[in-house]
């Protein structure tokens, strides 16, 4: 009889632990990460090479390289493009703008993080400022070193970008 009580008690604790985790996740802000490519998603043949291919990694690969991101927010990712930002054009900008506006209109989404190449990051940011009207934050991040570099800066930039998106002080600023 005692053994059944212990097993039932353990099952109850496990179930409660699972419930607590679900409640904690529900309390976290929801952030949508839209990926466009760029150096932040770049890959090189060797970590010591200087040349690389922009946009080689998809959004899920980028997000999985960021430790503890799940402690900041409930993250979902979507691939918009896989290009170097020097190849950004009207078609990609319009696709991105439409998607940003659609995501910002979702009641359960608290903000957007965009991963982008640095060549045209500021042009994209300015364009999005002109075509979005939500008070929810839209943050853009890029990197100087590809994802496969010895000291890739993308994971830290993504982490810090999500931290900005989830900060209440970021609302109403773009």
Task: Give each language-model segment a name.
Residues 1-25:
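Gram-negative bacterial Sec-dependent N-terminal signal peptides
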Residues 19, 25-174:
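Active-site histidine-anchored catalytic micro-motif
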């Amino acid at each position: 009889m005692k053994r059944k009580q212990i097993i039932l008690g353990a099952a109850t604790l496990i179930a409660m632990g699972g419930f607590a985790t679900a409640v904690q996740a529900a309390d976290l802000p929801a952030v949508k990460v839209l990926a466009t490519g760029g150096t932040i998603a770049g890959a090189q043949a060797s970590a010591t090479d200087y040349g690389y291919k922009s946009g080689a990694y998809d959004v899920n690969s980028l997000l999985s390289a960021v430790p503890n991101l799940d402690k900041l927010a409930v993250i979902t990712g979507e691939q918009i493009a896989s290009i170097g930002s020097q190849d950004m054009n009207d078609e990609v900008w319009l696709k991105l703008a439409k998607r940003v506006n659609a995501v910002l209109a979702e009641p359960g989404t608290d903000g957007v993080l965009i991963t982008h190449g640095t060549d045209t990051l500021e042009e994209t940011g300015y364009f999005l400022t002109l075509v979005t009207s939500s008070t929810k934050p839209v943050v853009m991040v890029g990197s100087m070193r590809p994802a496969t570099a010895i000291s890739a800066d993308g994971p830290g930039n993504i982490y810090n970008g999500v931290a900005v998106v989830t900060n209440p002080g970021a609302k109403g600023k773009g």
